[in-house]
């Protein structure tokens, strides 16, 4: 029996639903998750070692073998690549003496690529375990690696003043918030949280829900479902136990608004959860925080503890006997699919983040099979302000179908990237002027799963649910950028991030990505474009979850808005063989199949 594993199990009371937290602690202790500890973990959690390994293998950040004392994850997002990623990558390989995907012989360094880590406004960026380094350049890499070789820890390098990890100054030492405009809802002024909760507790739960319904607040995670209606459905569901979950798994490339909200206004978010708990009638809440934001965890835990000490969280909130509600932070471990609310719930239960078949919906059967309301970070912050200022105040902003304001995560080819609070209804051109975007050709709205729109064709369109729906990501590309290369990167992202549970997403995106590569290589014909349209429609129609259903959109939206980037690459199709057919490759595959068959039959 390993005493370290015993201690970890005791820390979580051998609760199977805390498996993700347990795996994080195991990896922190050993540097990876060794096979040797799985039987003891399994015995304590009443799981087989295979069950544990199956779950661990699903998540990007869990390692099954020693991968270096310092595990370096360099963001390889599109924005990183247009801001110096390649030079930084080469510097890392040069200074560590290894290639990406390798661990050095001395076991000091491991180099890994990772998708967007929520720092698109300050790329290139990397994680060394749970410590962040931004605005990287080759010279900075040389300095960081030299200090690591001298024995300094990543935290000592990023935080030379030795600031406590619970302090906002610690976070600010590593990451900039870059709040460019402070609108009326999220960052302006200080809310008297005690007075706000006292005001809410004077209302009946149904009146709180009615206020949110009247405000016309819609979910800020992307789907845009009525927040008040979701709460009402959850409240009306028959169950003594219900849950509220804050989705802080901000995995859509180009999005970082939730990171900034959790940094600059975390208590507004948490009090929004308390208000939801009062309205719905539940006692427990969870913040699902993406693994890339581990550096925020201690700071957020301190914010929660301060709320408990102030009587705004925990037992008898606001002095009301019987109103008990508390929040725990559940760390993710690097899985884009966990942005889907049902996959997130699976992860909270200590499982693979596999999307559930719907119905039933989470408000009917969610966490542990109980009614659960899952809302976005921005949604909860908006709730606090609505209950403070009133539904009419919020509804007066925006458009009739899109009330209030929207936080935009602006990045790419502009002079002022960062966070902008704008009213719904602002035009594309107005935002571009605001952020200093010159010579803009395209804007990726809502990340790769959203729309790639043309500035020339769509400049006067409005950001609103009824026109250009936006989950917060606003990524700008100028006329120098190769849009086909961007499409290829986005499709590669979906290939790698598919959970693999359904064939349309798992296999369809591989084929779609291959078609894009053929176009870039000058080996595609019109039939390939026709296939991309029909296959993309099939993936959209038949994928199991919403994330899979949006995965072909990088291709489909650029085919619609920028058909010339495809047409200019096509070759004429003559004869019986498609231009993409490679006889040598085909024969090589046949010969390999014969060899494999011979080995099997020996």
From Swiss-Prot:
UniProt enzyme class: oxidoreductase
Gene Ontology CC terms: cytoplasm
Assigned EC number: 1.12.1.2
GO molecular function, one term: metal ion binding
Keyword Lipid biosynthesis attached: no
Subcellular location: Cytoplasm
Needed cofactors: FMN; [4Fe-4S] cluster
Record's cofactor remark: Binds 1 FMN.
UniProt KW keywords: 4Fe-4S, Cytoplasm, Flavoprotein, FMN, Iron, Iron-sulfur, Metal-binding, NAD, Oxidoreductase, Plasmid
Binding-site residues for NAD(+), renumbered to this chain: 219-228
Annotated FMN binding sites: 332-379
Binding site for [4Fe-4S] cluster: 499, 502, 505, 545
Recorded catalytic activity of this chain's protein: H2 + NAD(+) = NADH + H(+)
One Pfam match: 2Fe-2S_thioredx
Biological role: Subunits alpha and gamma of HoxS constitute an NADH--oxidoreductase.
PANTHER family membership: NADH-QUINONE OXIDOREDUCTASE SUBUNIT F (PTHR43578:SF3)
Family recorded in the similarity comment: Belongs to the complex I 51 kDa subunit family.
Protein name: NAD-reducing hydrogenase HoxS subunit alpha
Originating organism: Cupriavidus necator (strain ATCC 17699 / DSM 428 / KCTC 22496 / NCIMB 10442 / H16 / Stanier 337)
Gene label: hoxF
């Amino acid at each position: 029996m390993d005493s370290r594993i015993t201690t970890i199990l005791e820390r979580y009371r051998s609760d199977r639903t805390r498996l993700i937290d347990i795996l994080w602690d195991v990896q922190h202790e050993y540097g990876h998750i060794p096979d040797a500890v799985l039987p003891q973990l399994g015995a304590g959690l009443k799981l087989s070692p295979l069950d544990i390994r199956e779950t661990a293998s699903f998540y990007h950040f869990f390692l099954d073998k020693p991968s270096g004392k310092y595990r370096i994850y360099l963001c390889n997002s599109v924005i990183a690549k247009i801001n110096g990623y390649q030079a930084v990558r080469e510097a890392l390989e040069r200074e560590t003496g290894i290639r990406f995907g390798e661990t050095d012989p001395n076991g000091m360094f491991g180099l890994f690529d990772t998708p967007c880590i929520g720092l698109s406004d300050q790329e290139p960026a990397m994680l060394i375990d749970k410590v962040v380094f931004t605005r990287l350049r080759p010279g900075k890499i040389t300095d960081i690696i030299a200090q690591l070789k001298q024995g300094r820890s990543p935290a000592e390098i990023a935080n030379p003043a030795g600031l406590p990890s619970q302090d906002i100054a610690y976070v600010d030492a590593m990451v900039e918030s870059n709040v460019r405009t402070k609108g009326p809802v999220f960052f302006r002024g200080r809310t008297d949280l005690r007075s706000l909760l006292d005001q809410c507790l004077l209302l009946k739960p149904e009146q709180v829900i009615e206020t949110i319904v009247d405000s016309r607040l819609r979910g800020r995670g992307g789907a845009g479902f009525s927040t008040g209606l979701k709460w009402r459905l959850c409240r009306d569901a028959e169950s003594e136990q219900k849950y509220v979950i804050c989705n802080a798994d901000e995995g859509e490339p180009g999005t970082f608004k939730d990171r900034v909200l959790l940094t600059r206004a975390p208590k507004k978010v948490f009090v929004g959860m308390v208000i939801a708990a009062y309205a719905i009638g539940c006692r427990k809440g969870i913040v699902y925080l993406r693994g890339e934001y581990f550096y925020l965890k201690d700071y957020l835990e301190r914010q929660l503890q301060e709320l408990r000490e102030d009587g705004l969280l925990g037992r008898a909130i606001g002095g009301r006997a019987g109103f008990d509600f508390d929040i725990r932070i559940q760390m993710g471990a690097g899985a884009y699919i966990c942005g889907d609310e049902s996959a997130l719930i699976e992860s909270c239960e200590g499982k693979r983040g596999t999307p559930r078949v719907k119905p039933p919906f989470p408000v009917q059967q969610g966490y542990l099979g109980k009614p659960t309301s899952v809302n976005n970070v921005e949604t909860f912050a908006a709730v606090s302000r609505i209950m403070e200022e009133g539904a009419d105040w919020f509804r007066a902003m925006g458009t009739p179908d899109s009330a209030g304001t929207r936080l935009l995560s602006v990045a790419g080819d502009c002079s002022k990237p960062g966070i902008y609070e704008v009213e719904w209804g602002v035009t594309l051109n107005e935002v571009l002027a605001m952020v200093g975007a010159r010579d803009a050709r395209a804007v990726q709205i809502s990340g790769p799963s959203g729309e790639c729109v043309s500035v020339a064709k769509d400049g006067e369109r409005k950001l609103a649910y009824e026109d250009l729906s936006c989950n917060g990501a606003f990524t700008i590309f100028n006329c120098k950028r190769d849009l086909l290369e961007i499409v290829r990167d986005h499709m590669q992202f979906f290939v790698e991030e598919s959970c693999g549970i359904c064939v349309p997403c798992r296999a369809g995106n591989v084929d779609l990505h291959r078609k894009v590569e053929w176009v870039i290589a000058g080996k595609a014909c019109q039939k390939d474009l026709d296939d991309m349209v029909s296959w993309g429609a099939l993936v959209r129609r038949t994928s199991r979850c919403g994330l899979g259903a949006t995965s072909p959109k990088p291709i489909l939206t650029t085919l619609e808005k920028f058909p010339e980037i495809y047409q200019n690459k096509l070759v004429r199709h003559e004869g019986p063989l498609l231009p993409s057919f490679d006889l040598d490759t085909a024969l090589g595959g046949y010969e390999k199949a014969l060899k494999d068959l011979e080995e099997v039959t020996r």
